[in-house]
Amino acid sequence: MKFSLSAAVLAFAVSVAALPQHDVNAAGNGVGNKGNANVRFPVPDDITVKQATEKCGDQAQLSCCNKATYAGDVTDIDEGILAGTLKNLIGGGSGTEGLGLFNQCSKLDLQIPVIGIPIQALVNQKCKQNIACCQNSPSDASGSLIGLGLPCIALGSIL
């Protein structure tokens, strides 16, 4: 019994040692080895704050958001009486990818040129989290017929 337990422990140790090594500094690098791992819709590196603000339009403001919820874009069709029940209970199924909705956002302002020298700050340098376009008015769906309030939408999803 002691021999088989020792052999099992030794076999486990050898198999763990044989696994390929991963980069230790790769945690949280996100899409393309850049930024936060929660950024599903990255913004291209050459987009400036001014260009991003123009893309959001005059009814929304450019924001940097900490929290993201993704839904839409994926539809699963399950067949049978209990098909997909477990998957939907644990968070899989329809709505696992797609449109990014954000909260805990702070506004990204355009820099005012100092002494006539325009500053073209890149949006990815100003915000390392989720970059989004947020409504200027507070999101409140209580008086709405549909009852839907979309406070912020990922900038990368509309580019």
From Swiss-Prot:
The gene is rodA. Disulfide bonds join C56-C133, C64-C127, C65-C105, C134-C152. It is found in: Secreted; Spore wall. Induction: Expression is significantly down-regulated by the anti-fungal phenylpropanoid isoeugenol. Belongs to the fungal hydrophobin family. Keywords: Cell wall biogenesis/degradation, Conidiation, Disulfide bond, Secreted, Signal, Sporulation, Virulence. PROSITE patterns: HYDROPHOBIN (PS00956). Its main location: secreted. The lineage of its organism: Eukaryota, Fungi, Dikarya, Ascomycota, Pezizomycotina. SMART domains: HYDRO. Self-assembles to form functional amyloid fibrils called rodlets. Self-assembly into fibrillar rodlets occurs spontaneously at hydrophobic:hydrophilic interfaces and the rodlets further associate laterally to form amphipathic monolayers. This is Class I hydrophobin 1. It comes from the Eukaryota. InterPro entries: Hydrophobin, Hydrophobin_CS. Pfam families: Hydrophobin. GO terms for cellular component: extracellular region; fungal-type cell wall.
